Amino acid sequence: MDQQEAPIYYGRSVNKVYNQEFIIDSRFKIVKELGHGAYGIVCSAKYDNGSKKVPDSNNGNASSSANASFVAIKKITNIFSKNILCKRALRELKLLQFFRGHKNITCLYDLDIIPNPMTGEFNEIYLYEELMECDMHQIIRSGQPLSDQHYQSFIYQVLCGLNFIHSADVLHRDLKPGNLLVNADCELKICDFGLARGFSENPDENAGFMTEYVATRWYRAPEIMLSFTNYTKAIDIWSVGCILAELLGGKPLFRGKDYVDQLNQILMILGTPPESTLQRIGSHRAQNYVRSLPITRKASYEELFPDANPLALDLLERMLTLDPRERITVRDALNHKYLELWHDPKEEIECQVKFDFKSFETVDGLDEMKQLIMDEVQKFREFVRKPIEEQQRIQMQLHMQKREEQRQEEEEKELLEQQRQFPAQESMDISQTPYNNLETNIGTPQVEDDYPRPQELDEFTFSNLESSSSMNLFQDMAKPSGEEYIKLEEELGFGLDGAMFNNYCNDHQ
Protein backbone atom coordinates (compact mmCIF):
# COMPACT_ATOMS: atom_id res chain seq x y z
CA MET A 1 0.00 0.00 0.00
CA ASP A 2 1.33 3.42 -0.96
CA GLN A 3 1.93 5.51 2.15
CA GLN A 4 2.47 8.79 0.26
CA GLU A 5 -0.01 11.64 0.53
CA ALA A 6 -2.99 10.57 -1.54
CA PRO A 7 -4.11 12.84 -4.39
CA ILE A 8 -7.68 14.15 -4.42
CA TYR A 9 -10.25 13.01 -6.98
CA TYR A 10 -13.92 14.06 -6.85
CA GLY A 11 -13.38 15.11 -3.24
CA ARG A 12 -11.97 11.69 -2.36
CA SER A 13 -8.42 10.55 -1.71
CA VAL A 14 -6.85 8.21 -4.25
CA ASN A 15 -4.85 5.41 -2.62
CA LYS A 16 -2.88 2.55 -4.11
CA VAL A 17 -3.97 -0.81 -2.68
CA TYR A 18 -2.86 -4.08 -4.24
CA ASN A 19 -1.72 -2.00 -7.23
CA GLN A 20 -5.26 -0.73 -7.79
CA GLU A 21 -6.91 2.63 -7.27
CA PHE A 22 -8.74 2.73 -3.95
CA ILE A 23 -10.75 5.95 -3.83
CA ILE A 24 -12.31 6.81 -0.48
CA ASP A 25 -13.56 9.77 1.51
CA SER A 26 -10.60 11.98 2.37
CA ARG A 27 -11.50 11.87 6.08
CA PHE A 28 -10.62 8.19 6.16
CA LYS A 29 -7.03 6.98 6.26
CA ILE A 30 -6.12 3.50 5.08
CA VAL A 31 -4.73 1.41 7.96
CA LYS A 32 -4.29 -2.08 6.58
CA GLU A 33 -4.95 -4.20 3.54
CA LEU A 34 -7.27 -7.01 4.55
CA GLY A 35 -7.87 -9.01 1.42
CA HIS A 36 -8.39 -9.01 -2.31
CA GLY A 37 -9.84 -11.24 -4.99
CA ALA A 38 -11.01 -11.27 -8.56
CA TYR A 39 -13.88 -8.89 -7.86
CA GLY A 40 -12.95 -6.86 -4.82
CA ILE A 41 -10.57 -5.33 -2.31
CA VAL A 42 -11.08 -4.84 1.42
CA CYS A 43 -9.13 -2.48 3.69
CA SER A 44 -9.45 -1.25 7.23
CA ALA A 45 -9.49 2.51 7.63
CA LYS A 46 -9.61 5.05 10.41
CA TYR A 47 -12.15 7.85 10.53
CA ASP A 48 -9.98 10.94 11.05
CA ASN A 49 -12.20 13.93 11.81
CA GLY A 50 -10.99 15.44 15.04
CA SER A 51 -12.53 13.89 18.15
CA LYS A 52 -15.64 12.62 16.39
CA LYS A 53 -16.31 8.92 16.25
CA VAL A 54 -18.37 6.78 13.97
CA PRO A 55 -21.90 6.49 15.44
CA ASP A 56 -22.92 3.24 17.09
CA SER A 57 -25.00 0.83 15.03
CA ASN A 58 -27.97 0.59 17.38
CA ASN A 59 -28.66 4.09 18.64
CA GLY A 60 -26.68 6.50 16.52
CA ASN A 61 -24.52 7.63 19.44
CA ALA A 62 -20.75 7.59 19.35
CA SER A 63 -19.52 4.17 20.28
CA SER A 64 -17.03 3.67 23.06
CA SER A 65 -15.67 0.44 21.62
CA ALA A 66 -12.09 0.13 20.49
CA ASN A 67 -13.13 0.01 16.85
CA ALA A 68 -15.51 2.99 17.06
CA SER A 69 -13.32 5.08 14.74
CA PHE A 70 -12.35 2.24 12.43
CA VAL A 71 -14.24 0.84 9.48
CA ALA A 72 -13.89 -1.82 6.83
CA ILE A 73 -14.10 -0.38 3.33
CA LYS A 74 -14.89 -2.80 0.56
CA LYS A 75 -14.40 -1.98 -3.08
CA ILE A 76 -16.35 -4.18 -5.48
CA THR A 77 -15.04 -4.02 -9.03
CA ASN A 78 -16.65 -4.89 -12.36
CA ILE A 79 -20.03 -4.55 -10.72
CA PHE A 80 -21.81 -3.86 -14.01
CA SER A 81 -19.90 -6.36 -16.14
CA LYS A 82 -22.33 -9.29 -15.72
CA ASN A 83 -26.03 -9.57 -15.01
CA ILE A 84 -25.50 -12.07 -12.20
CA LEU A 85 -23.00 -9.82 -10.41
CA CYS A 86 -25.21 -6.79 -10.82
CA LYS A 87 -28.29 -8.62 -9.51
CA ARG A 88 -26.47 -9.92 -6.44
CA ALA A 89 -25.08 -6.49 -5.69
CA LEU A 90 -28.56 -4.99 -5.95
CA ARG A 91 -29.94 -7.71 -3.67
CA GLU A 92 -27.22 -7.08 -1.12
CA LEU A 93 -27.65 -3.30 -1.04
CA LYS A 94 -31.42 -3.46 -0.66
CA LEU A 95 -31.33 -6.08 2.10
CA LEU A 96 -28.56 -4.34 4.03
CA GLN A 97 -30.70 -1.22 4.11
CA PHE A 98 -33.88 -3.12 4.98
CA PHE A 99 -32.34 -4.99 7.94
CA ARG A 100 -30.25 -2.04 9.09
CA GLY A 101 -30.35 -1.65 12.85
CA HIS A 102 -30.77 -5.24 14.02
CA LYS A 103 -27.95 -6.09 16.40
CA ASN A 104 -27.28 -9.52 14.90
CA ILE A 105 -27.37 -8.51 11.23
CA THR A 106 -24.67 -6.61 9.43
CA CYS A 107 -25.52 -2.98 8.88
CA LEU A 108 -24.13 -0.44 6.45
CA TYR A 109 -22.44 2.89 7.26
CA ASP A 110 -22.33 4.37 3.81
CA LEU A 111 -22.11 3.71 0.07
CA ASP A 112 -20.15 5.43 -2.65
CA ILE A 113 -19.92 5.04 -6.39
CA ILE A 114 -17.63 7.18 -8.55
CA PRO A 115 -16.20 6.99 -12.08
CA ASN A 116 -12.95 5.15 -12.66
CA PRO A 117 -10.07 7.67 -13.01
CA MET A 118 -8.72 5.87 -16.08
CA THR A 119 -11.90 5.06 -18.01
CA GLY A 120 -14.42 7.52 -16.59
CA GLU A 121 -16.98 4.71 -16.34
CA PHE A 122 -19.04 3.76 -13.28
CA ASN A 123 -18.13 0.16 -12.58
CA GLU A 124 -17.06 0.14 -8.92
CA ILE A 125 -18.90 0.52 -5.65
CA TYR A 126 -17.54 1.17 -2.15
CA LEU A 127 -19.21 -0.14 1.01
CA TYR A 128 -18.29 1.44 4.36
CA GLU A 129 -18.94 -1.01 7.18
CA GLU A 130 -18.06 -1.65 10.81
CA LEU A 131 -14.75 -3.40 11.34
CA MET A 132 -15.04 -6.73 13.14
CA GLU A 133 -12.06 -8.69 14.41
CA CYS A 134 -12.75 -11.97 12.62
CA ASP A 135 -15.35 -14.44 11.44
CA MET A 136 -16.47 -17.75 12.90
CA HIS A 137 -14.47 -19.76 10.39
CA GLN A 138 -11.24 -18.13 11.54
CA ILE A 139 -12.09 -18.72 15.21
CA ILE A 140 -12.74 -22.43 14.63
CA ARG A 141 -9.66 -22.83 12.45
CA SER A 142 -7.45 -21.08 15.02
CA GLY A 143 -8.03 -23.85 17.54
CA GLN A 144 -8.86 -21.43 20.35
CA PRO A 145 -10.53 -23.22 23.27
CA LEU A 146 -14.21 -22.32 23.44
CA SER A 147 -16.59 -23.08 26.27
CA ASP A 148 -20.09 -24.47 25.96
CA GLN A 149 -21.37 -21.01 26.88
CA HIS A 150 -19.60 -19.64 23.81
CA TYR A 151 -21.40 -22.19 21.65
CA GLN A 152 -24.73 -21.29 23.24
CA SER A 153 -24.17 -17.57 22.80
CA PHE A 154 -23.10 -17.85 19.17
CA ILE A 155 -25.98 -20.10 18.13
CA TYR A 156 -28.48 -17.98 20.04
CA GLN A 157 -27.29 -14.82 18.27
CA VAL A 158 -27.43 -16.53 14.88
CA LEU A 159 -31.00 -17.61 15.58
CA CYS A 160 -32.00 -14.11 16.74
CA GLY A 161 -30.76 -12.67 13.46
CA LEU A 162 -32.29 -15.49 11.43
CA ASN A 163 -35.63 -15.09 13.21
CA PHE A 164 -35.74 -11.47 12.09
CA ILE A 165 -34.73 -12.41 8.54
CA HIS A 166 -37.30 -15.20 8.24
CA SER A 167 -40.08 -13.03 9.66
CA ALA A 168 -39.56 -10.72 6.67
CA ASP A 169 -40.06 -13.74 4.36
CA VAL A 170 -36.40 -13.75 3.39
CA LEU A 171 -34.15 -16.79 3.19
CA HIS A 172 -30.43 -16.15 3.61
CA ARG A 173 -29.39 -19.31 1.72
CA ASP A 174 -25.67 -19.01 2.48
CA LEU A 175 -25.23 -19.32 6.23
CA LYS A 176 -21.77 -20.63 7.10
CA PRO A 177 -19.02 -19.77 9.62
CA GLY A 178 -17.37 -17.39 7.16
CA ASN A 179 -20.55 -15.31 7.02
CA LEU A 180 -20.81 -14.89 10.80
CA LEU A 181 -18.73 -11.96 12.05
CA VAL A 182 -17.53 -11.89 15.65
CA ASN A 183 -15.75 -9.29 17.76
CA ALA A 184 -13.77 -9.48 21.01
CA ASP A 185 -16.97 -9.01 23.04
CA CYS A 186 -18.41 -12.19 21.47
CA GLU A 187 -20.99 -10.16 19.56
CA LEU A 188 -22.06 -11.92 16.38
CA LYS A 189 -23.64 -10.58 13.21
CA ILE A 190 -24.83 -12.27 10.04
CA CYS A 191 -23.42 -10.91 6.79
CA ASP A 192 -23.53 -11.56 3.04
CA PHE A 193 -27.02 -11.33 1.56
CA GLY A 194 -25.98 -11.67 -2.08
CA LEU A 195 -27.70 -15.06 -2.43
CA ALA A 196 -30.80 -14.27 -0.37
CA ARG A 197 -34.23 -14.80 -1.88
CA GLY A 198 -37.83 -14.27 -0.97
CA PHE A 199 -40.12 -16.97 0.38
CA SER A 200 -43.85 -17.52 0.15
CA GLU A 201 -46.04 -20.05 1.93
CA ASN A 202 -47.59 -20.66 -1.50
CA PRO A 203 -45.29 -23.13 -3.33
CA ASP A 204 -46.40 -21.80 -6.73
CA GLU A 205 -44.97 -18.39 -5.89
CA ASN A 206 -41.57 -19.97 -5.19
CA ALA A 207 -41.22 -21.29 -8.72
CA GLY A 208 -37.71 -20.67 -10.00
CA PHE A 209 -36.73 -19.23 -6.68
CA MET A 210 -33.72 -21.53 -6.21
CA THR A 211 -32.02 -20.68 -9.50
CA GLU A 212 -28.33 -19.82 -9.27
CA TYR A 213 -28.11 -21.70 -5.97
CA VAL A 214 -24.36 -21.80 -5.44
CA ALA A 215 -24.05 -21.68 -1.66
CA THR A 216 -21.09 -23.42 -0.10
CA ARG A 217 -21.64 -27.16 -0.51
CA TRP A 218 -20.82 -28.24 3.04
CA TYR A 219 -23.76 -26.31 4.49
CA ARG A 220 -26.43 -27.17 1.89
CA ALA A 221 -29.61 -28.82 3.08
CA PRO A 222 -30.26 -32.38 1.81
CA GLU A 223 -33.40 -31.31 -0.05
CA ILE A 224 -31.16 -29.12 -2.19
CA MET A 225 -28.81 -32.02 -2.87
CA LEU A 226 -31.83 -34.16 -3.78
CA SER A 227 -33.08 -31.56 -6.27
CA PHE A 228 -36.28 -30.86 -4.35
CA THR A 229 -38.17 -27.89 -5.79
CA ASN A 230 -40.34 -26.77 -2.87
CA TYR A 231 -37.82 -25.17 -0.52
CA THR A 232 -38.72 -23.64 2.82
CA LYS A 233 -37.09 -21.70 5.63
CA ALA A 234 -35.81 -25.04 6.89
CA ILE A 235 -32.83 -24.80 4.52
CA ASP A 236 -31.35 -22.08 6.74
CA ILE A 237 -31.98 -24.12 9.89
CA TRP A 238 -29.98 -26.98 8.37
CA SER A 239 -27.06 -24.59 7.84
CA VAL A 240 -27.25 -23.46 11.48
CA GLY A 241 -27.14 -27.12 12.51
CA CYS A 242 -24.00 -27.62 10.43
CA ILE A 243 -22.44 -24.59 12.15
CA LEU A 244 -23.32 -25.95 15.60
CA ALA A 245 -21.77 -29.32 14.69
CA GLU A 246 -18.63 -27.55 13.50
CA LEU A 247 -18.36 -25.68 16.80
CA LEU A 248 -18.76 -28.92 18.75
CA GLY A 249 -16.31 -30.91 16.65
CA GLY A 250 -13.86 -28.26 15.51
CA LYS A 251 -14.33 -29.18 11.85
CA PRO A 252 -17.17 -29.33 9.30
CA LEU A 253 -19.49 -32.30 9.78
CA PHE A 254 -20.24 -32.92 6.09
CA ARG A 255 -17.14 -32.35 3.95
CA GLY A 256 -18.17 -33.63 0.55
CA LYS A 257 -15.59 -33.49 -2.23
CA ASP A 258 -18.27 -33.00 -4.85
CA TYR A 259 -22.03 -32.91 -5.23
CA VAL A 260 -22.57 -36.68 -5.01
CA ASP A 261 -20.04 -37.13 -2.22
CA GLN A 262 -21.78 -34.41 -0.20
CA LEU A 263 -25.06 -36.33 -0.37
CA ASN A 264 -23.25 -39.54 0.55
CA GLN A 265 -21.67 -37.90 3.60
CA ILE A 266 -25.07 -36.71 4.81
CA LEU A 267 -26.62 -40.16 4.41
CA MET A 268 -23.67 -41.83 6.17
CA ILE A 269 -24.44 -39.84 9.33
CA LEU A 270 -28.23 -39.43 9.14
CA GLY A 271 -28.89 -42.86 7.69
CA THR A 272 -31.07 -43.95 4.79
CA PRO A 273 -34.29 -41.91 4.72
CA PRO A 274 -37.71 -43.59 4.86
CA GLU A 275 -39.36 -44.10 1.50
CA SER A 276 -42.07 -41.57 2.36
CA THR A 277 -39.48 -38.89 3.07
CA LEU A 278 -37.47 -39.74 -0.03
CA GLN A 279 -40.51 -39.46 -2.29
CA ARG A 280 -41.41 -36.10 -0.82
CA ILE A 281 -38.02 -34.34 -0.92
CA GLY A 282 -36.21 -35.89 -3.87
CA SER A 283 -36.45 -35.73 -7.63
CA HIS A 284 -37.10 -39.00 -9.47
CA ARG A 285 -33.45 -39.31 -10.45
CA ALA A 286 -32.23 -38.53 -6.92
CA GLN A 287 -34.65 -41.09 -5.46
CA ASN A 288 -33.27 -43.80 -7.72
CA TYR A 289 -29.73 -42.94 -6.71
CA VAL A 290 -30.48 -43.12 -2.98
CA ARG A 291 -32.32 -46.43 -3.43
CA SER A 292 -29.23 -47.84 -5.16
CA LEU A 293 -27.08 -47.21 -2.08
CA PRO A 294 -26.63 -49.73 0.75
CA ILE A 295 -29.02 -49.15 3.65
CA THR A 296 -27.23 -47.14 6.34
CA ARG A 297 -28.07 -46.79 10.01
CA LYS A 298 -28.05 -43.38 11.65
CA ALA A 299 -24.81 -42.49 13.42
CA SER A 300 -24.75 -41.59 17.12
CA TYR A 301 -24.11 -37.93 17.91
CA GLU A 302 -22.96 -39.02 21.37
CA GLU A 303 -20.15 -40.98 19.71
CA LEU A 304 -19.35 -38.23 17.22
CA PHE A 305 -19.22 -35.56 19.94
CA PRO A 306 -18.45 -37.39 23.20
CA ASP A 307 -17.65 -34.21 25.16
CA ALA A 308 -20.68 -32.22 24.03
CA ASN A 309 -23.52 -31.02 26.22
CA PRO A 310 -26.43 -33.49 25.79
CA LEU A 311 -28.78 -30.56 25.27
CA ALA A 312 -26.58 -29.33 22.43
CA LEU A 313 -26.84 -32.74 20.79
CA ASP A 314 -30.61 -32.70 21.20
CA LEU A 315 -30.83 -29.34 19.43
CA LEU A 316 -28.42 -30.57 16.76
CA GLU A 317 -30.56 -33.62 16.05
CA ARG A 318 -33.66 -31.44 15.69
CA MET A 319 -31.85 -29.17 13.23
CA LEU A 320 -30.21 -31.89 11.14
CA THR A 321 -33.22 -33.92 10.05
CA LEU A 322 -33.57 -35.14 6.47
CA ASP A 323 -37.24 -34.20 6.26
CA PRO A 324 -37.53 -30.38 6.25
CA ARG A 325 -41.08 -30.65 7.61
CA GLU A 326 -39.72 -32.27 10.77
CA ARG A 327 -36.83 -29.82 11.16
CA ILE A 328 -37.11 -27.47 14.12
CA THR A 329 -38.23 -23.90 13.35
CA VAL A 330 -36.18 -20.88 14.29
CA ARG A 331 -38.77 -19.87 16.91
CA ASP A 332 -38.76 -23.30 18.56
CA ALA A 333 -34.97 -23.39 18.44
CA LEU A 334 -34.82 -20.09 20.32
CA ASN A 335 -36.95 -21.69 23.05
CA HIS A 336 -34.84 -24.85 23.26
CA LYS A 337 -33.45 -25.73 26.70
CA TYR A 338 -29.88 -25.59 25.42
CA LEU A 339 -30.26 -21.83 24.95
CA GLU A 340 -32.37 -21.03 28.01
CA LEU A 341 -29.47 -19.24 29.72
CA TRP A 342 -29.56 -16.63 26.94
CA HIS A 343 -33.29 -16.66 26.20
CA ASP A 344 -34.68 -13.12 26.27
CA PRO A 345 -37.88 -12.17 24.38
CA LYS A 346 -36.56 -8.63 24.00
CA GLU A 347 -33.79 -10.00 21.78
CA GLU A 348 -36.09 -12.22 19.70
CA ILE A 349 -37.94 -9.54 17.79
CA GLU A 350 -39.62 -10.07 14.44
CA CYS A 351 -39.73 -7.86 11.39
CA GLN A 352 -43.01 -6.00 11.03
CA VAL A 353 -42.71 -5.62 7.24
CA LYS A 354 -42.20 -8.21 4.50
CA PHE A 355 -39.30 -7.54 2.17
CA ASP A 356 -40.33 -6.90 -1.44
CA PHE A 357 -38.25 -8.86 -3.94
CA LYS A 358 -40.73 -8.36 -6.77
CA SER A 359 -39.66 -4.76 -7.35
CA PHE A 360 -36.27 -5.80 -8.75
CA GLU A 361 -35.91 -9.58 -9.10
CA THR A 362 -37.81 -9.54 -12.38
CA VAL A 363 -35.44 -6.95 -13.85
CA ASP A 364 -32.93 -8.65 -16.14
CA GLY A 365 -31.55 -5.87 -18.33
CA LEU A 366 -28.03 -4.82 -17.33
CA ASP A 367 -28.67 -1.13 -18.01
CA GLU A 368 -31.86 -1.17 -15.96
CA MET A 369 -30.16 -2.94 -13.04
CA LYS A 370 -27.28 -0.49 -13.23
CA GLN A 371 -29.71 2.39 -12.89
CA LEU A 372 -31.40 0.71 -9.92
CA ILE A 373 -28.04 0.38 -8.15
CA MET A 374 -27.14 4.00 -8.88
CA ASP A 375 -30.51 5.06 -7.44
CA GLU A 376 -30.01 2.89 -4.34
CA VAL A 377 -26.60 4.41 -3.67
CA GLN A 378 -27.91 7.94 -4.10
CA LYS A 379 -30.94 7.41 -1.85
CA PHE A 380 -28.88 5.77 0.86
CA ARG A 381 -26.23 8.50 0.79
CA GLU A 382 -28.93 11.12 1.20
CA PHE A 383 -30.59 9.15 3.99
CA VAL A 384 -27.52 8.63 6.18
CA ARG A 385 -26.63 12.31 5.97
CA LYS A 386 -29.88 13.38 7.57
CA PRO A 387 -30.16 13.94 11.36
CA ILE A 388 -30.96 10.80 13.31
CA GLU A 389 -34.50 11.99 14.12
CA GLU A 390 -35.19 12.60 10.43
CA GLN A 391 -33.85 9.15 9.56
CA GLN A 392 -36.21 7.53 12.05
CA ARG A 393 -39.17 9.53 10.75
CA ILE A 394 -38.44 8.56 7.14
CA GLN A 395 -37.96 4.92 8.07
CA MET A 396 -41.24 4.92 9.99
CA GLN A 397 -43.10 6.41 7.02
CA LEU A 398 -41.64 3.87 4.62
CA HIS A 399 -42.53 0.97 6.89
CA MET A 400 -46.08 2.23 7.41
CA GLN A 401 -46.50 2.64 3.67
CA LYS A 402 -45.19 -0.85 3.00
CA ARG A 403 -47.41 -2.38 5.67
CA GLU A 404 -50.46 -0.67 4.19
CA GLU A 405 -49.58 -1.95 0.72
CA GLN A 406 -49.16 -5.47 2.05
CA ARG A 407 -52.44 -5.23 3.97
CA GLN A 408 -54.28 -4.16 0.83
CA GLU A 409 -52.65 -6.95 -1.15
CA GLU A 410 -53.77 -9.52 1.42
CA GLU A 411 -57.32 -8.12 1.35
CA GLU A 412 -57.40 -8.37 -2.43
CA LYS A 413 -56.22 -11.98 -2.30
CA GLU A 414 -58.85 -12.81 0.31
CA LEU A 415 -61.57 -11.14 -1.76
CA LEU A 416 -60.56 -12.99 -4.92
CA GLU A 417 -60.50 -16.29 -3.04
CA GLN A 418 -63.99 -15.74 -1.61
CA GLN A 419 -65.29 -14.68 -5.01
CA ARG A 420 -63.85 -17.88 -6.47
CA GLN A 421 -65.54 -20.01 -3.80
CA PHE A 422 -68.85 -18.08 -3.72
CA PRO A 423 -69.37 -16.51 -7.17
CA ALA A 424 -73.02 -15.70 -6.44
CA GLN A 425 -72.01 -13.43 -3.58
CA GLU A 426 -69.49 -11.27 -5.42
CA SER A 427 -71.29 -8.08 -4.44
CA MET A 428 -71.04 -8.85 -0.73
CA ASP A 429 -68.95 -6.33 1.17
CA ILE A 430 -66.36 -8.60 2.77
CA SER A 431 -63.47 -6.17 3.02
CA GLN A 432 -62.64 -5.38 6.62
CA THR A 433 -59.94 -2.93 7.61
CA PRO A 434 -57.82 -4.57 10.31
CA TYR A 435 -55.99 -2.67 12.99
CA ASN A 436 -52.89 -0.79 11.87
CA ASN A 437 -49.98 -0.88 14.30
CA LEU A 438 -47.70 2.12 14.02
CA GLU A 439 -44.52 0.13 14.53
CA THR A 440 -41.21 0.08 12.74
CA ASN A 441 -39.75 -3.18 11.52
CA ILE A 442 -37.33 -3.11 14.47
CA GLY A 443 -40.15 -3.09 17.00
CA THR A 444 -39.37 -4.45 20.46
CA PRO A 445 -42.09 -6.31 22.40
CA GLN A 446 -43.04 -5.07 25.82
CA VAL A 447 -41.56 -7.29 28.51
CA GLU A 448 -42.16 -6.60 32.16
CA ASP A 449 -39.32 -8.58 33.65
CA ASP A 450 -35.65 -7.83 33.21
CA TYR A 451 -34.08 -11.14 32.35
CA PRO A 452 -30.78 -11.83 34.09
CA ARG A 453 -27.84 -12.13 31.76
CA PRO A 454 -25.08 -14.69 32.26
CA GLN A 455 -21.66 -13.51 33.23
CA GLU A 456 -19.60 -12.06 30.42
CA LEU A 457 -17.81 -14.59 28.27
CA ASP A 458 -14.07 -14.62 28.05
CA GLU A 459 -12.78 -12.29 25.35
CA PHE A 460 -11.01 -13.71 22.35
CA THR A 461 -7.35 -13.28 21.53
CA PHE A 462 -6.97 -12.56 17.85
CA SER A 463 -3.20 -12.49 17.53
CA ASN A 464 -3.11 -16.05 16.21
CA LEU A 465 -5.75 -15.51 13.54
CA GLU A 466 -4.49 -15.22 10.02
CA SER A 467 -6.55 -12.32 8.77
CA SER A 468 -9.51 -10.04 9.30
CA SER A 469 -13.12 -11.09 8.98
CA SER A 470 -13.24 -9.14 5.77
CA MET A 471 -11.28 -11.96 4.16
CA ASN A 472 -14.40 -14.13 4.18
CA LEU A 473 -15.23 -12.39 0.92
CA PHE A 474 -12.51 -14.25 -0.91
CA GLN A 475 -12.05 -17.52 0.99
CA ASP A 476 -13.56 -20.79 -0.12
CA MET A 477 -13.53 -23.61 2.40
CA ALA A 478 -14.92 -26.11 -0.12
CA LYS A 479 -13.28 -25.33 -3.43
CA PRO A 480 -15.70 -26.43 -6.19
CA SER A 481 -14.59 -28.14 -9.33
CA GLY A 482 -15.99 -28.34 -12.82
CA GLU A 483 -19.30 -26.69 -13.64
CA GLU A 484 -21.08 -27.61 -10.41
CA TYR A 485 -21.10 -24.09 -9.10
CA ILE A 486 -19.38 -20.77 -9.42
CA LYS A 487 -16.15 -19.87 -7.67
CA LEU A 488 -16.61 -17.97 -4.46
CA GLU A 489 -14.95 -14.92 -5.98
CA GLU A 490 -17.71 -14.81 -8.58
CA GLU A 491 -20.35 -14.85 -5.87
CA LEU A 492 -19.00 -11.53 -4.58
CA GLY A 493 -19.84 -12.47 -1.00
CA PHE A 494 -21.03 -9.00 -0.04
CA GLY A 495 -21.57 -8.04 3.57
CA LEU A 496 -19.39 -7.07 6.46
CA ASP A 497 -20.59 -5.77 9.72
CA GLY A 498 -21.76 -2.16 9.90
CA ALA A 499 -23.74 0.39 11.83
CA MET A 500 -25.74 3.58 11.44
CA PHE A 501 -23.72 6.33 9.83
CA ASN A 502 -26.08 9.29 10.09
CA ASN A 503 -23.68 12.23 10.28
CA TYR A 504 -20.75 10.70 8.50
CA CYS A 505 -20.41 13.24 5.65
CA ASN A 506 -22.84 16.11 6.22
CA ASP A 507 -21.09 18.44 3.82
CA HIS A 508 -19.67 15.80 1.46
CA GLN A 509 -20.58 16.17 -2.18
Curated annotation (Swiss-Prot):
Disruption phenotype: Leads to thermosensitive growth, enhanced caffeine and caspofungin sensitivity, and alterations of cell surfaces. Also leads to a decreased pathogenicity in mice through displaying a greater susceptibility to nitric oxide (NO), a reduced inhibitory effect on macrophage NO production, and an increased capacity of macrophage stimulation by cell wall extracts. Residues 28-339 form the Protein kinase domain. Keywords: ATP-binding, Coiled coil, Kinase, Nucleotide-binding, Phosphoprotein, Serine/threonine-protein kinase, Stress response, Transferase, Virulence. Pfam families: Pkinase. Signal peptide: none annotated. One of its GO terms (biological process) is regulation of fungal-type cell wall biogenesis. Residues 400-448 are annotated as: Disordered. ATP binds at L34, G35, H36, G37, A38, Y39, G40, I41, V42, K74. Residues 422-444 have a biased composition (Polar residues). Residues 392-423 form a coiled coil. Its cofactor is Mg(2+). Its EC number is 2.7.11.24. GO terms for molecular function: ATP binding; MAP kinase activity; protein serine kinase activity. Activated through phosphorylation of Thr-211 and Tyr-213 from the TXY motif. Phosphorylated in a PKC1-dependent manner in response to cell wall perturbations, oxidative stress, osmotic stress, and low temperatures. Also activated in response to physical contact leading to contact-dependent cellular behaviors such as invasive hyphal growth and biofilm development. Phosphorylation is also PBS2- and HOG1-dependent. The modification Phosphotyrosine is found at Y213. The TXY motif contains the threonine and tyrosine residues whose phosphorylation activates the MAP kinases. Serine/threonine protein kinase component of the cell integrity pathway, a signal transduction pathway that plays a role in yeast cell morphogenesis and cell growth. Participates in cell wall construction, azole resistance, and host interaction. Required for the signaling for invasive filamentous growth and biofilm formation, and plays a crucial role in virulence. This is Mitogen-activated protein kinase MKC1. It comes from Candida albicans (strain SC5314 / ATCC MYA-2876). The gene is MKC1.
